[in-house]
């Protein structure tokens, strides 16, 4: 192959000669890999680590030759041959296999960055991810601490090489994003399958910290602000948000998932407000949506508002307050970012979250003071009156703003429906009188005030 490549430089059939040289060289390296497999697996002349070390040397030599010749097919053939032969040597999807493929990816990185070969990045990166996933699934039946280290190393190397590829080769941006999305997935699987909750949380936190560090450097460090593309930086932020959510679900008890996700939604909401970032706002909205759905099934269920006996306690109070804070903060952040939603459905959903959070917090607080039927009835009186007061405030503010006026009218209708359909059937005695009397007085005072504002 070397001889034919040298001859092809000065001949008219140079392209054909180069192709033949690439084919011969690739065949030669493939034969060397098969020799290593035979010496290790069939005849047992060398151990598996020694065989992998020899295979790595052959791969490095092949990549060096491909770089010198600028022969992408040769580089692909060497890397893929090495990746295919490695499982034949280890015979198990273990830490040794993952470690070898990580070293192979590191060896291929300088060549693919220097020559701008995105296909080589995929050929070196995809086997690492697949081997790490298979090894994690296999390792769930066997306790192997070294496997966790190998998977963590694979994630670290994969993410870093993806970032280097995106920065050094902007034209390979999509390939780098694909590698970035794939690289952390073994850590997402390894935490729940291989580790206990605290250790799994540390693994997930490390993955999140790595992704956040790359995002922060690309976003705030002036020297790197233009090095990574906006699309890649957005992808890093999205993967960091996914990693943080997966870490939360893995490390936190299921009874506190909603509270934890809502706390993270508030943190992201503050970040979106300060940074005026649409991507951060989208992440905060996703966290808040999942937190609300989990709250309905856990800390702040609807059953706690319908029947006495299912007291939410302190978790329900905290979760309700977090729902209220999220329902207020996220629209404020959207206004500051300049991405105010125009869909009435989104505003209606936000209003429902706000009402449910306030009602759940009120119910939990009253039942913490007196976990009796009187406490339950008092909570419903306060919930109804708070809805009426909020509706009046919206109507008064909506004299010149149609959307606020419509929201106030809808909330008034909901308050009266609750008063007549639920409170009338649930409350009795003094509680019923107090609820109707207070609601009527508030509506009377607000109606007269609203009429004066309209005349003015």
Regions found by a protein language model. Name each.
Residues 1-385, 394-405, 417-456:
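Extended, compositionally biased regions that are outside compact catalytic cores
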Residues 412-416:
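Pro/Ser/Thr/Gly-rich intrinsically disordered low-complexity regions
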């Amino acid at each position: 192959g070397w001889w034919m490549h040298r001859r092809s430089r000065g001949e008219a059939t140079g392209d054909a000669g180069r192709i033949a040289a690439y084919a011969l060289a690739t065949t030669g390296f493939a034969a060397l890999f098969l020799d290593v497999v035979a010496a290790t697996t069939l005849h047992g002349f060398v151990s598996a680590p020694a065989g992998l070390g020899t295979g790595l040397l052959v791969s490095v030599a092949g990549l060096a030759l491909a770089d010198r010749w600028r022969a992408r097919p040769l580089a692909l053939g060497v890397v893929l041959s090495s990746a295919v032969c490695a499982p034949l040597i280890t015979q198990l999807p273990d830490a040794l296999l993952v470690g070898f493929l990580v070293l192979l990816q590191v060896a291929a990185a300088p060549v693919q960055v220097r020559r701008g070969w995105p296909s080589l990045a995929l050929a070196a990166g995809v086997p690492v991810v697949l081997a790490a996933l298979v090894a994690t699934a296999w390792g769930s039946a066997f306790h192997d601490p070294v496997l966790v280290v190998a998977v963590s190393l694979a994630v670290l190397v994969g993410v870093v090489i993806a970032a280097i590829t995106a920065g050094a080769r902007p034209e390979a941006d999509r390939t780098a994003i694909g590698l970035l999305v794939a690289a952390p997935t073994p850590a997402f699987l390894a935490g729940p399958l291989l580790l206990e909750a605290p250790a799994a949380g540390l693994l997930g936190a490390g993955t999140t910290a790595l992704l956040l560090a790359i995002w922060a450097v690309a976003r705030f460090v002036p020297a790197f602000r233009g090095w990574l593309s906006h699309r890649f930086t957005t992808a890093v932020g999205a993967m960091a948000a996914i990693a943080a959510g997966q870490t939360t679900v893995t490390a936190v008890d299921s009874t506190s998932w909603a509270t934890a996700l809502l706390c993270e939604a508030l943190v992201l909401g503050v970040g979106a407000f300060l940074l005026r970032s649409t991507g951060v706002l989208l992440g905060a909205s996703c966290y808040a949506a999942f937190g609300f759905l989990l709250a309905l099934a856990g800390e702040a269920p609807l059953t706690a508002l319908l029947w006495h006996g299912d007291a939410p306690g302190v978790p329900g109070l905290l979760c309700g307050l977090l729902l209220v804070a999220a329902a207020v903060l996220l629209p404020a952040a959207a206004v500051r970012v300049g991405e105010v939603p125009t869909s009435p459905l989104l505003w209606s959903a936000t209003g429902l979250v706000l009402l449910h959070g306030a009602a759940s917090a009120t119910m939990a607080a009253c039942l913490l003071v007196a976990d009796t039927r009187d406490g339950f009835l008092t909570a419903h009186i306060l919930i109804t009156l708070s809805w009426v007061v909020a509706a009046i405030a919206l109507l008064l503010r909506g004299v010149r703003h149609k959307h606020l006026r419509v929201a106030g009218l809808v909330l008034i209708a909901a308050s009266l429906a609750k008063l007549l359909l639920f409170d009338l059937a649930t409350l009795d005695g003094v509680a019923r009188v107090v609820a109707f009397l207070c609601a009527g007085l508030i509506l009377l005072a607000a109606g007269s005030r609203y009429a004066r504002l309209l005349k003015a």
